[in-house]
């Protein structure tokens, strides 16, 4: 157990018991992947969307685990450790955003995607919803998914490399490659079902870890007095409104806007067996999320006192969870906690790889081969989907080979890109009959471009004026929303009867019919 005043480095060397736990964890993932392979290799819909036959509990934890990547276990505790309780605005904004997403987006998207040509990707839904015979919206939205998800997956690869480097002293690149090989294996073979089932398993592992570490840390320190000691070190540590600026609080809170446009999360709503099961999924999923995020904040707060009393500096705050887990627990339990970090990392990577693979297959390859070929040669399209998983993973590894940013920063950029490009479009496509194809394309592009410009040219001016530190999703989301509405007002609407479709969708959601 932990003894105050001793060296961190003398207590964090993993032994064979830690390795055994990790090997067992990897084997479980591969077994689940094999099960998914045996169950869902028949056609593209099954491989990409589980045949729309996923239950509420798997849907909930799959959405949660694919959302709460390595940033929750490594990034958020590190941010709380650095800035104090004010970083909890991020957790508050995300929880509120996820809850609204379940209420506003999930029911209509589940019904409308099936009604609109049984769309299995977001670009496919946009195309059918807007009657886009030119396929321009499908190509552009598909390209945005491929670009931003490749960058998003890159953040997961970085997390995996950092974990193995900090926990085992393993070379960063070897650790990253090990994570990539395992994720590729079960995603390649098992498809959506394997990804969802492994996400469920990994979600259970994650919540146990996030509850366990801060509680044990408190017991090892001074119980609830730990927080008093944390405040004594710096009064702003326990002040929700200090330790950051007003712009910082707004930016943290604005992360919740991103949920409306995250393809790897909202695809979970499309795959649930029935719209009637969504309330169960919502209660279970939001409960899991709130407890996990509370635990992450707890790790950061207890870590402030924990590291201070150990008399040791921490070089990278994002390794706080790793250090606390290895010092506080028996190596076997420490291995379990490392598995929890891997669970967070790999659950997100696998979901992102599958969504990107789906987009490459459905939104690009199908356009080249044609609809008839897709129906006649489904195994060919499944194979293309699997090969796409490998290609995207390789590109992400290449980008992540030389990490030069924080995990939270990498995730934040990709999150903003998707939230701004797709968030307003998803909401308007589900609720507004006046949406046009030209408006949708203009809004998507403007949102993505504003995010990129803000990151590249505006944020570097943050030292001049704090306003420029505003999270890029806010200007990107607002720009996309305004441009979409304004352009739609002056351009041609779809030829199909959208008002009748929206009325039918409302009816189906209300009655719960499949």
Swiss-Prot record:
The chain crosses the membrane at residues 17-37, 54-74, 85-105, 144-164, 174-194, 204-224, 246-266, 284-304, 327-347, 381-401, 407-427, 438-458, 467-487. GO terms for cellular component: plasma membrane. Pfam families: SSF. It is found in: Cell membrane. Signal peptide: none annotated. InterPro entries: Na/Glc_symporter_sf, Na/Pro_symporter, Na/solute_symporter, Sodium:Solute_Symporter. One of its GO terms (biological process) is proline transport. It is a multi-pass membrane protein. It catalyses: L-proline(in) + Na(+)(in) = L-proline(out) + Na(+)(out). Keywords: Amino-acid transport, Cell membrane, Ion transport, Membrane, Sodium, Sodium transport, Symport, Transmembrane, Transmembrane helix, Transport. One of its GO terms (molecular function) is proline:sodium symporter activity. NCBIfam families: Na_Pro_sym (TIGR02121), sss (TIGR00813). Catalyzes the sodium-dependent uptake of extracellular L-proline. Belongs to the sodium:solute symporter (SSF) (TC 2.A.21) family. This is Sodium/proline symporter 1. It comes from Staphylococcus saprophyticus subsp. saprophyticus (strain ATCC 15305 / DSM 20229 / NCIMB 8711 / NCTC 7292 / S-41). The gene is putP1.
């Amino acid at each position: 157990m932990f003894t105050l005043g001793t060296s961190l480095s003398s207590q964090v060397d993993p032994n064979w018991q830690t390795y055994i736990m990790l090997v067992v964890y990897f084997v479980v993932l591969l077994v689940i992947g094999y099960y998914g392979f045996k169950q869902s290799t028949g056609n593209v819909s099954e491989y990409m969307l589980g045949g729309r036959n996923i239950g509420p509990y798997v849907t909930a934890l799959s959405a949660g685990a694919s959302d709460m990547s390595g940033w929750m276990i490594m990034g958020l505790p590190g941010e709380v450790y650095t800035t104090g309780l004010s970083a909890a605005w991020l957790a508050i904004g995300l929880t509120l955003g996820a809850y609204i997403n379940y209420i506003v987006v999930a029911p209509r998207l589940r019904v409308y995607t099936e009604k609109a040509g049984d769309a299995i990707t977001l670009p496919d839904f946009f195309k059918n919803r807007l009657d886009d015979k030119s396929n321009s919206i499908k190509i552009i939205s598909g390209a945005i998914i491929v670009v931003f998800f490749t960058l998003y997956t890159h953040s997961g690869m970085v997390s995996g490399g950092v974990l193995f480097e900090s926990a085992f002293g393993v070379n960063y690149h070897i650790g990253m490659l090990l994570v990539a090989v395992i994720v590729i294996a079960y995603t390649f073979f098992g498809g959506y079902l394997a990804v969802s089932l492994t996400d469920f398993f990994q979600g259970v592992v994650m919540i146990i870890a996030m509850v366990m570490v801060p509680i044990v840390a408190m017991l090892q320190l001074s119980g609830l007095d730990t927080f008093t000691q944390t405040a004594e070190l710096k009064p702003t540590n326990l002040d929700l409104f200090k330790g950051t600026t007003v712009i910082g609080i707004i930016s943290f809170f604005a992360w919740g806007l991103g949920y409306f446009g995250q393809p790897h999360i909202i695809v979970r709503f499309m795959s649930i067996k029935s719209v009637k099961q969504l309330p169960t999924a919502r209660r279970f999923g939001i409960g899991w999320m709130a407890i996990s995020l509370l635990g992450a904040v707890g790790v950061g707060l207890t870590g402030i006192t924990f590291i201070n009393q150990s008399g040791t500096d921490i070089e990278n705050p994002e390794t706080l969870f790793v250090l606390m887990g290895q010092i506080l627990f028996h190596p076997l339990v420490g291995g379990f906690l490392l598995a929890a970090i891997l669970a967070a990392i790999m659950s997100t990577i696998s979901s992102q790889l599958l969504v990107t693979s789906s987009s490459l297959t459905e939104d690009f390859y199908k356009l080249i081969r044609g609809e008839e070929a897709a129906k006649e040669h489904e195994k060919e399209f499944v194979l293309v989907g699997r090969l796409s998983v490998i290609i995207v993973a390789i590109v992400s590894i290449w980008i992540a080979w030389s990490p030069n940013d924080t995990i939270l920063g990498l995730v934040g950029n990709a999150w903003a890109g998707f939230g701004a490009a797709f968030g307003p479009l998803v909401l308007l496509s589900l609720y507004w009959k006046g949406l046009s194809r030209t408006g949708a394309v203009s809004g998507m592009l403007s949102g993505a471009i504003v995010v990129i410009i803000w990151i590249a040219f505006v944020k570097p001016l943050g030292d001049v004026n704090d306003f420029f530190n505003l999270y890029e999703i806010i200007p990107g989301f607002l720009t996309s929303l305004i441009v979409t509405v304004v352009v739609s007002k002056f351009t041609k609407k779809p030829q199909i009867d959208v008002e009748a479709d929206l009325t039918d969708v409302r009816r189906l959601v209300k009655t719960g019919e499949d």
